[in-house]
């Protein structure tokens, strides 16, 4: 009897799945890497069918899906449910789970335990951590256990308050040097890729040139090795304010609103459902049904009079 596991071990790609070493090859060939967020099975499947290389189950779900004002309230349990759904839909892309605030800040041990949960309970291929500094030992610990890690520097939403709000980072020489140092440190700690968020394009391009691992930009210009956008932003689903780096490729909020409004109008005017939306019953069976129901109603009326 075969003992081969149905689910590949961490770092071992499933058949047909993009392998992490291929990302380095894409960087070497200057082939842009496409990453997009997803939060459920349908969005994961559509991202896969559209040709995305990486799918990030972002803690941005706290805002786009769960209705919070920031990413901070996202919990491990919520992120695991969302990631599990995405992995059911996305087969070829690498699925990366965003470690939410509080899941890795306390200690290396807790960070590793939560990363293991993502792999075991949701089927994630990798995890993403924000920041450098104390995050470096967390990265080393997780990578040491065989779980791939994506880094994230620049604007890190989980610590936006400490950074002075949702603002671009690295806009002075000193801060740009710090960003480069953080990115290099994350690479040395074992990250297979690094997100650069809200970083001036020339700074992001220089960081990309100096790193051997791929960079994924969001608001970091066209000189990074790849790009990422939030699902709800690029589809025009998110109704809040969007950063300047967002490009909307559709206005699905309007499309959906119009569709639901049309449905509501049809229901109220009794235009829906039509005959094509209903199920038939043979005439003889309908007659028997009515006869039976009528007899039962008659017997009930007699009992009530008694």
Which residues are covered by each model-predicted region?
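Alpha/beta enzyme core
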Residues: 2-244, 250, 254-283, 287, ...
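Conserved small/polar residues in nucleotide/adenosyl-binding loops
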Residues: 300-306
